[in-house]
């Protein structure tokens, strides 16, 4: 019994020391979350209980290993983090400073995604690709961008600085700086502080799902013709 208590005590001390080191190393990120989330009561709560921070810490380590070409270890850390946090960030993704994932569950960030500084992402966001091509195939997100819950930003596109992507929007084209985008597919409703008139004629609005189906049908016909 005494031996068991000693082991528990040692494990607890090691864990607390590890968390103290993480607090020092990631104080900037912790402070950033405290400033952006009114629900955060203090920095210790953020350090111990915020899965968005845990996913970011894991990604920093995984990305370092990825850059060292230790791909298996990098991916292993990424998968372990995904299991515990519900957030999937490929170790190849490049993420700037003051990045905050609020709530976090279901967030997916692809391998070639690039995220600037001071970006806020809510639950269910996908920064994904649209095909099987190699090379840059995921979005580039500028500085001071907010991406609402459930939004999908797809393909090798750029979201300009100081932009806001509305909840559940599907963005498949470049977005200029200082813009607000909503809807499926995403449409700019405000730019540089000016409201943009949006046509509600859905006949001419591109449906990305139907477009993908049509492309598949064309490929099938080509294969059948061989």
Where do the model's predicted regions map?
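Structural signal for interior beta-strand "rungs" in well-ordered beta-sheet cores
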Residues: 82-189
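Low-complexity, compositionally biased segments
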Residues: 159, 164-168, 195, 204, ...
């Amino acid at each position: 019994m005494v031996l068991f208590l000693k082991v528990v005590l040692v494990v607890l001390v090691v864990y607390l020391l590890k968390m103290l080191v993480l607090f020092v190393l990631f104080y900037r990120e912790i402070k950033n979350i405290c400033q952006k989330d009114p629900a955060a009561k203090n920095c210790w709560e953020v350090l111990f209980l915020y899965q968005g921070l845990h996913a970011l810490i894991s990604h920093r380590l995984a990305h370092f290993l990825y850059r060292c070409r230790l791909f298996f270890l990098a991916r292993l850390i990424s998968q372990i983090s995904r299991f515990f946090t519900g957030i999937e960030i490929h170790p190849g993704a490049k993420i700037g400073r003051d990045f905050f994932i609020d709530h976090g569950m279901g967030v997916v960030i692809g391998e070639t995604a690039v995220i600037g500084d001071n970006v806020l992402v809510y639950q269910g966001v996908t920064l994904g690709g649209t095909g099987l091509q190699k090379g840059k195939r995921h979005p580039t997100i500028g500085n001071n961008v907010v991406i609402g819950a459930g939004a999908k930003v797809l393909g090798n596109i750029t979201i300009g600085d100081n932009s806001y992507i509305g909840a559940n929007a599907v963005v498949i084209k470049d977005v200029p700086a200082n813009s607000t985008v909503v809807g499926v597919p995403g449409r700019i409703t405000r730019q540089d502080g000016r409201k943009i008139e949006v046509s509600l004629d859905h006949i001419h609005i591109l449906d990305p799902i139907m477009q993908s189906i049509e492309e598949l049908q064309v490929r099938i016909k080509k294969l059948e013709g061989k």
